């Protein structure tokens, strides 16, 4: 049985076997994000800026999809560790129901608020029109992202991460192939411009979701996801969101931060475009760490449910080391090749002049971020996702945006980028405090009788 692997395989080998396929697939996705923006930049800078300004809503969609899936994954892995397989099936079905409901909500939102959303961020009419076209398509036809994420987490929860790699990579590769064809009208296709970029995105997501569903039906024998006779279970949905909601808030706060930064940077013209380019580039660094987390969460959750304290502790230590190591590589690359990275997006010298100090300064926060990202997922795996939420709110809303706004008053855009390292340092301190707290309250008591835990706490 797959659960035995998560309870017995050597930790290093287990983390790699669980995480590497997801990391590879997320790297492919990150490559898609970069390639997609490179193709869009060939239309003009206004189109690239529009895609950058659309990011907060797209990020919010991903926040709801991934955050819900995090709750499903952690709850499901813990239930499988407890050997309650019937309950695991019910959890999986309720997760699928939530994914469909989430899509319907965003389809309505995309149809109604796209124009006022862009009007609030820019006065440039060309940027607005590009943005409305792009975002409306991504929202109204965005069911794929919700179902893809849910079906992939069902595979991850039972240790079948290789199929997740296949689905994510296939979806991203389809995106990459279709982007130039639909944007520029190759091979007899109509020239769709920025609408082509949106269509390529949603089509790739739908294909990936379909593949993930097929893999679950064909190979995921631990779970029965048939919806025949299904009725929503409010209690289980509540348990999913007990872990998932803080994760949603954590990522949604990121969307709000991006929107706030776009408003702050609006006074500096092309700085909005630079900020968008940075986010595309940083995804290539952050995505492998997120992939590491996706492999780590079910390992910790399973061994927590199975009361294997030593394996929980070693998984945390090794994951932190891997996460920080990955971020150090990203820091080095952005300090050695900042101008070359900007030129990939057809950037003119004026844009490069803003972009180089931005990449060099913001990337200083990467090392701290590696620790904080991994530790945040540890909180979620142990059913304490609220700690991740507190850290995220404090970092982005209480530190980053206020500091960025304060520094913007100087009129020097290069100073604004320092808000990121400052905020990440605050996040490091708070994350460390919560990690010590959760170790004393939960981790060190794993395997003890319940009465002993209660007395200690």
Language model: regions and residue ranges:
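Structural signal for membrane-spanning alpha-helices in multi-pass inner-membrane proteins
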Residues: 110, 153, 179, 183, ...
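Helix-terminus/linker motif at the lipid-water interface of multi-pass membrane proteins
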Residues: 27, 31-49, 118-125, 181-192, ...
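Hydrophobic transmembrane alpha-helices of multi-pass small-molecule transporters
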Residues: 60-63, 175-180, 209-213, 284-287, ...
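Transmembrane helical elements of multi-pass membrane transporters/channels
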Residues: 17-36, 137, 148, 171, ...
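Short alpha-helical transmembrane segments in multi-pass integral membrane proteins
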Residues: 1-19, 76-143, 191-245, 300-365, ...
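Small-residue-rich hydrophobic transmembrane alpha-helices
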Residues: 48-111, 145-164, 274-332, 336-338, ...
């Amino acid at each position: 049985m797959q659960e035995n692997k998560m309870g017995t395989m050597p930790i290093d080998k287990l983390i790699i076997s669980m995480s590497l396929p997801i990391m590879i697939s997320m790297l492919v996705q990150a490559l898609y994000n970069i390639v997609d923006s490179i193709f869009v930049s060939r239309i003009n800078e206004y189109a690239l800026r529009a895609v950058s300004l659309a990011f907060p809503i797209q990020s919010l969609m991903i926040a709801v999809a991934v955050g819900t899936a995090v709750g499903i994954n952690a709850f499901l892995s813990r239930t499988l560790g407890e050997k309650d397989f019937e309950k695991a099936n019910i959890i999986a079905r309720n997760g699928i129901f939530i994914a469909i409901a989430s899509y319907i909500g965003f389809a309505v939102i995309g149809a109604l608020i796209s124009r006022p959303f862009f009007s609030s961020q820019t006065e440039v009419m060309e940027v607005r029109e590009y943005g409305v076209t792009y975002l409306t398509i991504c929202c109204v036809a965005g069911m794929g992202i919700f179902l893809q994420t849910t079906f992939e987490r069902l595979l991850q929860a039972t240790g079948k991460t290789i199929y997740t790699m296949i689905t994510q990579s296939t979806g991203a590769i389809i995106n990459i192939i279709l982007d130039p064809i639909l944007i520029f009208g190759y091979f007899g296709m109509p020239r769709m411009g920025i609408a082509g970029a949106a269509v390529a995105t949603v089509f790739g997501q739908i294909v990936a979701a379909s593949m993930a569903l097929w893999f679950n039906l064909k190979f995921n024998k631990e779970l029965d996801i048939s919806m025949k006779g299904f009725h929503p279970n409010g209690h289980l949905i509540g348990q999913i969101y007990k872990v998932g909601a803080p994760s949603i808030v954590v990522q949604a706060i990121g969307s709000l931060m991006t929107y706030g930064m776009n408003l702050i940077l609006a006074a500096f013209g092309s700085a909005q475009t630079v900020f968008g380019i940075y986010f595309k580039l940083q995804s290539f660094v952050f995505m492998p760490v997120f992939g590491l987390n996706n492999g780590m969460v079910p390992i910790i959750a399973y061994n927590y449910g199975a009361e294997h304290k030593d394996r929980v502790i070693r998984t945390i230590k090794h994951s932190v080391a891997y996460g920080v190591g990955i971020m150090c590589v990203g820091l080095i690359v952005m300090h050695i090749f900042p101008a070359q990275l900007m030129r990939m997006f057809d950037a003119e010298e004026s844009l490069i002049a803003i972009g180089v100090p931005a990449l060099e300064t913001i990337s200083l926060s990467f090392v701290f971020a590696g620790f904080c990202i991994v530790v945040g997922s540890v909180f979620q795996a142990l059913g304490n996702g609220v700690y991740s939420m507190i850290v995220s709110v404090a970092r982005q809303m209480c530190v980053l945006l206020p500091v960025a706004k304060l520094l913007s008053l100087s009129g020097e855009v290069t100073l604004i980028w320092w808000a990121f390292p400052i905020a990440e340092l605050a996040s490091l301190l708070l994350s460390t405090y919560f990690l010590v707290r959760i170790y004393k309250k939960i981790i060190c008591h794993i395997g003890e009788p319940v009465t002993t835990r209660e007395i200690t706490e």
